[in-house]
UniProtKB/Swiss-Prot annotation:
HAMAP family: RecX. It comes from Pseudomonas aeruginosa (strain LESB58). The keyword DNA damage does not apply. GO terms for biological process: regulation of DNA repair. The lineage of its organism: Bacteria, Pseudomonadati, Pseudomonadota, Gammaproteobacteria, Pseudomonadales. Coiled coil: none annotated. Modulates RecA activity. It is found in: Cytoplasm. Keywords: Cytoplasm. Belongs to the RecX family. This is Regulatory protein RecX. GO terms for cellular component: cytoplasm. Its main location: cytoplasm. InterPro entries: RecX_HTH_1st, RecX_HTH_2nd, RecX_HTH_3rd, Regulatory_RecX, WH-like_DNA-bd_sf.
Length: 153
């Protein structure tokens, strides 16, 4: 039986339940609460209060999201796009990506090593490896450097 989110207490409880599972951005949390039937008049004050109490923190969400995606082998371009699709401001995304302590070059090499482990032998293999790494979110410049056997760290 679905819970009715028609009171401030019910909306707050639902928001806290979602935040207990993992960090959420404000836009994502608002969308999930609307999907569960809460009205904007109840959602906004509840989220404002959670933010004041430090339970809803965009910077903590960004840090958590970036770390999670980086551990999964995704590069900065893909992470940037996913965060933008989730409604986060570009300036905040850029700040968080700049502050993260991920060595994107080392991560690119590790993702490539796990998947391919050897330099491409012909143009077809090079294109295949390049497409895979580009899909994962790495820059064409970094990919080209790696696949051409140069490590300009």
């Amino acid at each position: 039986m679905a819970t009715v989110l028609d009171t401030p207490v019910a909306v707050r409880r639902a928001a806290m339940d979602l935040l207990a599972r993992r960090e959420h951005g404000r836009a994502e949390l608002s969308r999930k609460l609307r999907q569960r039937g809460a009205s904007a008049e109840l959602i906004d004050p509840a989220l404002d209060r959670l933010a004041e109490e430090g339970l809803l923190d965009e910077s903590r969400y960004l840090e958590s999201f970036i770390a999670s995606r980086a551990r999964s082998g995704h590069g900065p371009l893909r992470i940037r796009e996913e965060l933008a699709q989730r409604g986060l401001p570009r300036a905040d995304i850029e700040r968080a990506l700049g502050a993260c302590e991920v060595d994107w070059s080392a991560q690119l090499r590790e993702v490539w090593r796990r998947k391919f482990a050897r330099l491409p032998q012909d143009a077809r293999e090079k294109a295949q490896q390049g497409r895979f790494l580009a899909y994962r979110g790495y820059s064409m410049e970094s990919i080209s450097r790696l696949l051409n056997g140069r490590s300009d760290d």
